[in-house]
């Protein structure tokens, strides 16, 4: 069963709240892909996910480091930003494949920069600027993703 839904978010607090609600239902081995133009709120959404998972320290954008790992109590959360990739093979060359495993959650901003090399996401999230704030499109690609989204919304 696929979950596919759209929501309007009037401000940053609504974006954070939605992400925090979703985080409660995430499981190790899940992959989430975030799409949207620069400044659309992708890193804000990741910050909300991490807050929902109990992480309270600073959340940095991995634009220049490419990946920021967050060691949580039961698993590692990897936040990727592939914006600077010029070629999909840079993902493989960077050795990121090993991060996608049953003991971690991987969240990837700009997944299209890695082409079809990335594993299938459980959930894809697209954020866009609107006159009222932000618009978010949530879509599951696996049954685990659908369960997570249904429970969170």
Task: State what each model feature region is.
Residues 38:
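The conserved Walker
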Residues 55-71:
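Short beta-strand-centered segment that lines the nucleotide-binding/catalytic pocket of NTP-utilizing
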